[in-house]
Regions:
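Bacterial N-terminal signal peptides that target proteins for export
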Residues: 1-11
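Bacterial N-terminal signal peptides
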Residues: 10-20
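C-terminal region of N-terminal signal peptides and the immediate post-cleavage residues
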Residues: 19-34, 39
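Short, surface-exposed binding/anchoring microloops in extracellular/periplasmic proteins
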Residues: 35-67
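Glycine-centered tight beta-turn/hairpin loop motif at sheet-sheet or coil-to-beta transitions
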Residues: 37-39, 108, 127
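A low-complexity, Ser/Thr/Gly/Pro-enriched, surface-exposed linker/loop concept
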Residues: 54-100, 130-145
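Acidic, glycine-rich flexible loop segments
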Residues: 91-122
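Short, exposed beta-strand-loop hairpins at the edges of beta-sheets
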Residues: 119-134
Length: 145
């Protein structure tokens, strides 16, 4: 190969490697957790549009009959920059959750998640300073500032 061709090929390879290495960073600010059974899940993510904490619970179906049938909706609680509340969610998460054993705590993406012994998750959204509970019911314990 000629030196120019080799340099161009090396440059293209380096550029492709840089693009490939940068691709996972799009999800680097996404943190997904669940209780040990996997029936209560939370995803915390940051985008250019803002910060979101979203938690869903299969356990809360009795407390939230408006969020049925199971194949279409799930009880949820959501924290965003300008809104905190409960709703029925109809989408999945972007990645599989990390299962938390009871009494464990994880932090990431602007939230701290505590796995309670009964399977509920308590989430302190440290960006909004909101406290939510998701499990047997979905609740906003403190709406934040």
């Amino acid at each position: 190969m000629k030196p120019r061709t080799t340099a161009a090929l090396a440059g293209a390879t380096i550029a492709l490697a840089a693009i490939t290495a940068a691709a996972p960073t799009a999800h680097a600010s996404t943190h997904t957790y669940s209780n040990q059974r996997g029936d209560v899940r939370c995803e915390i993510y940051n985008t250019p549009q803002g910060h979101t904490t979203l938690c869903v619970s299969d356990k809360a179906r009795k407390a939230h009959p408006e969020c049925n049938p199971p194949q279409a909706l799930i009880p949820a609680v959501k924290v965003e920059d300008n809104w905190v509340g409960t709703l029925c969610w109809n989408q999945g998460f972007t990645q599989p959750p990390q299962k938390l054993s009871p009494m464990s705590v994880r932090s990431g993406g602007g939230a701290t998640v505590f796995a309670a012994p009964g399977g509920d998750l308590f989430v302190l959204d440290t960006i909004k300073m909101a406290l939510i509970q998701v499990g047997s019911a979905t609740k906003v314990l403190f709406p934040g500032f």
